């Protein structure tokens, strides 16, 4: 009887595995596609642009610094696979004025055609204890990390729905899946992208438009190096419990997931665990994905409790260390 039950379970899983591709989105063909990348002058954004260009896409790079844009353009063009490919550069702050963002998207579409894939990669990170952060820091991060993704997405979505095809990618962070010491401003702005993505996916899925939320870990980028200069000790020690990823590795995974129409894009085993653990009511791209989340949830929650205990221990040790230093200073 037990053997029969096991055989039935295996047969059921195999059936799901075979049926799953039939209900998954049709992959987006990148050769000849128009890909817009905000925050594309450096870091993950630039690497995403390179990865798409390698596969034959036409690229529109959007960022604030014109000099960095032109430098990135030269680097990306080295990876062309045919002489028809184009890299268009547009200098604009995507978080300030929606009408300006809408206009530059129209310009890009007039030159390179309708946008097939938008990658919202513009963002920044600032860390610090809640009471030490200025209120303006919360406003700034919400503007750049959240509205800086809302505006470009709003500018392309109508055309995608009309064409009944497209991809919209939101680059969040693992700090957009769990809140950590020092990230009260950053995490909240990245968590907001998850809610936006889930609601938007439900709206546009009937039009064959698919949304991807990427949750990269700490990545070796200029932004990460700058963030480390002011990162609280507790935040730095927690971050050091995992390794730093290369932006090329992160970009390759994001592009792969976006092309496939996957809602979640995670990097590495920790990323996979976090995405499964925090899936909530998020959409799934395949039956197998949903089944994996159901099966692994209990195990991953158990592992997560050990992680949380470790992080809390780091915070307590730092607190005790500071208290000792204060005592020494008072007695000196």
Curated annotation (Swiss-Prot):
Print the keywords alphabetically. Endoplasmic reticulum, Lipid metabolism, Membrane, NADP, Nucleotide-binding, Oxidoreductase, Proto-oncogene, Signal, Sphingolipid metabolism, Transmembrane, Transmembrane helix
Q: Which reaction does it catalyse?
A: sphinganine + NADP(+) = 3-oxosphinganine + NADPH + H(+)
GO molecular function list: 3-dehydrosphinganine reductase activity; NADPH binding
Q: Which residues cross the membrane?
A: 270-290, 293-313
Q: Which InterPro entries match?
A: KDSR-like (IPR045022), NAD(P)-bd_dom_sf (IPR036291), Sc_DH/Rdtase_CS (IPR020904), SDR_fam (IPR002347)
Tell me the enzyme class. Answer: oxidoreductase
Query: Per the database entry, which stretches of residues form a coiled coil?
Result: none
An example of a Pfam family matching this protein is adh_short
Parts of the chain on the Lumenal side:
291-292
The illness linked here is:
Defects in KDSR may be the cause of a bovine form of spinal muscular dystrophy.
- What job does the chain carry out? Catalyzes the reduction of 3'-oxosphinganine (3-ketodihydrosphingosine/KDS) to sphinganine (dihydrosphingosine/DHS), the second step of de novo sphingolipid biosynthesis.
This protein is called what?
Answer: 3-ketodihydrosphingosine reductase
Species this protein is from: Bos taurus
Q: Which gene encodes it?
A: KDSR
């Amino acid at each position: 009887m037990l053997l029969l039950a096991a055989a039935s379970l295996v047969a059921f899983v195999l059936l799901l595995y075979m049926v799953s591709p039939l209900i998954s989105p049709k992959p987006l063909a990148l050769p000849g596609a128009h890909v817009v990348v905000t925050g594309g002058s450096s870091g993950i954004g630039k690497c995403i642009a390179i990865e798409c260009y390698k596969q034959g896409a036409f690229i529109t790079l959007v960022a604030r610094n014109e000099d960095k844009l032109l430098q990135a353009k030269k680097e990306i063009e080295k990876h062309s696979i045919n002489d028809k490919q184009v890299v268009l550069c547009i200098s604009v702050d995507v978080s300030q004025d929606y009408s300006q963002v809408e206009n530059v998207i129209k310009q890009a579409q007039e030159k390179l055609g309708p946008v097939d894939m938008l990658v919202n990669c513009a963002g920044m990170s600032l860390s610090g204890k809640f009471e030490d952060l200025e209120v303006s820091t919360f406003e700034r991060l919400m503007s750049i990390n959240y509205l800086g993704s809302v505006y470009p997405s709003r500018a392309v979505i109508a055309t995608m729905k009309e064409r009944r095809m497209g991809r919209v990618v939101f680059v969040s962070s693992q700090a957009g899946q769990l809140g950590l010491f020092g990230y009260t401003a950053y995490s909240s702005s990245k968590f907001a992208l998850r809610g936006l993505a889930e609601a938007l996916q439900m709206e546009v899925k009937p039009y064959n438009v698919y949304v991807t939320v990427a949750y990269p870990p700490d990545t070796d980028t200029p932004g990460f190096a700058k963030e480390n200069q002011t990162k609280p000790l507790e935040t730095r020690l927690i971050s050091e419990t995992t390794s730093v990823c290369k932006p090329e590795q992160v970009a390759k995974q994001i592009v792969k997931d976006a092309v496939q129409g996957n809602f979640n894009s995670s990097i590495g085993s920790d990323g996979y665990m976090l995405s499964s653990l925090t899936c909530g009511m998020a959409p799934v791209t395949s039956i197998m994905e949903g089944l994996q989340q159901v099966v692994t949830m209990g195990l991953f929650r158990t592992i997560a409790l050990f992680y949380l205990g470790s992080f809390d221990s780091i915070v307590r040790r730092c607190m005790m260390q500071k208290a000792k230093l204060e005592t020494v200073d008072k007695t000196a």
